[in-house]
Amino acid sequence: MAEFVMRDLAAKWRAERGAAADIEFEIASAATSTEQLGNEVYPGTRRKLAEHGIGCAGKRARQMNRGDYARYDYLIGMDSLNRRDMTRICGGDPEGKIHLLLDFTGQKRDVADPWYTDDFETTWNDVLAGCTALLAKLTGG
């Protein structure tokens, strides 16, 4: 969900600024485990994104790898288990690139996980708040 929310917010930010938008974004997501590799976006997530006019067609889960640490400026996890696994996969975090999404909101907690609760609305709210705060940090806004 976060990949597509962030893409949507970044596209809107860029559209509002036109030629003045001098920041390039490369936004992607990857799993920290092998459980969902190759799967499409979870149906509940697809529905919630569609409610907000955001598509996710063609996305298939891939696993994060050590090369992602060199490729990206920020590596964002949804929960503390993600952060632990990301740090392990990357062999540490010497450049301080690994963060939790809600850290950017000042809330030191995990994004609500709809896997067991089926509460995609709470997850949407967490992801939107985190992505909005992250975009503001990246753009100085």
Can you say where each PLM-predicted feature lies in the sequence?
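Conserved active-site segments centered on acidic
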Residues: 1-71, 136-141
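Small/polar loops that bind or transfer phosphate-bearing groups
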Residues: 29, 77-78
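Phosphate-binding/catalytic loops
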Residues: 68, 74, 80-141
